[in-house]
């Protein structure tokens, strides 16, 4: 998928996310992960780290070599998505206390991923 399509889908997911209430913890985390994945892929395409026909689905599904290769330009975007992915099982599939704070953190990481992607798009 090309960068422009990733931007379009991420923005669509974020429009839906904006309709969620603070207590909609599971949906906020899930949306942050989905939109964040699109922002990450857009950034990776725009900086030339990954071609448009190769997308990251989940950081934990990457080979060690791919994770390292994609982290070389800047390790933070992959780390941010990985953190959202780590939040997901505990608060979306589990019932750990502190869900609202976890959702806030996921959304904060999403904001940072979007900023990275928009900066990468501006530099292409």
Task: Name each region found by the language model.
Residues 1-124:
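Terminal alpha-helical segments
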């Amino acid at each position: 998928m090309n960068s422009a399509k990733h931007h379009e889908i991420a923005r669509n997911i974020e429009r839906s996310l904006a309709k969620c209430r603070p207590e909609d913890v599971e949906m906020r985390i899930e949306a942050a992960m989905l939109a964040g994945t699109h922002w990450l892929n857009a950034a990776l395409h725009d900086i030339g780290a990954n071609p448009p026909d190769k997308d990251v689905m989940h950081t934990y599904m990457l080979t060690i070599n791919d994770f390292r290769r994609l982290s070389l330009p800047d390790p933070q975007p992959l780390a941010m998505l990985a953190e959202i992915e780590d939040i997901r099982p505990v608060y979306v599939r589990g019932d750990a206390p502190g869900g609202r704070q976890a959702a806030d953190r996921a959304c904060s990481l999403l904001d940072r991923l979007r900023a990275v992607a928009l900066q990468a798009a501006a530099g292409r």
